[in-house]
Amino acid sequence: SKLCQKDTDARWMTKAGERHYGFKDHINADEKTKLITKYSVTSAVPHDSTEIKNLIDKSDNRLHGDSAYRSKEIEEHLKISECESFVHEKGYRGNPLTDIQKESNNKKSKIRARVEHIFGFMTNSMNNALFMRSIGIKRIKESIGLLNLTYNLFRFEQLIRLEKVKI
């Protein structure tokens, strides 16, 4: 009976010294409209970069991401998908970023921040909607899918009201 109250799909992970339990919503969003175009749900453990292949395809032409997305494997996948990389450059011990690289990362951050606005909206304006109490990845995937759809409806209404999109 205890097993039916326990989520065997969810996992614990630590990020910046804070422990998190549950699942992650990985999204692909349009950089101009901030609408979610694709999403993927995983337990909290896998690194964000592992889902990139499920979110990027030939219809995408640019990837904006932090330095966690910089790897040879991801760069190869982006070439195959004909997607241009705007991923932040990493500094290493003994090989820090140059001023040009820092400036380049700063420009990339302005666009990448638009994705963070989506999660901020879900947390602040949608009553902390990312905090879900469901058991099982199937239910969580359905809930997150509906959450992403609801966000898109809010955003679409805003785009129409601000006359950014014409019907």
Model-flagged regions — what are they?
Residues 103-167:
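Basic, amphipathic alpha-helical segments enriched in Lys/Arg and hydrophobic/aromatic residues
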Residues 50, 73, 94-101:
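Short, charged, surface-exposed secondary-structure boundary motifs
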Residues 60, 82, 141-144:
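Active-site lining segments that contact anionic ligands and/or coordinate catalytic metals
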Residues 67, 89-90, 117:
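Short secondary-structure boundary segments
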Residues 62-64, 86-87, 162:
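Acidic/polar loop patches that form or flank catalytic/metal-binding clefts of enzymes
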Residues 1-79:
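Polybasic low-complexity intrinsically disordered regions
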Residues 81-89:
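Short hydrophobic/aromatic-enriched beta-strand-loop microsegments
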Residues 41, 89-93:
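Short, acidic/turn-prone active-site loops that include or flank metal/cofactor-
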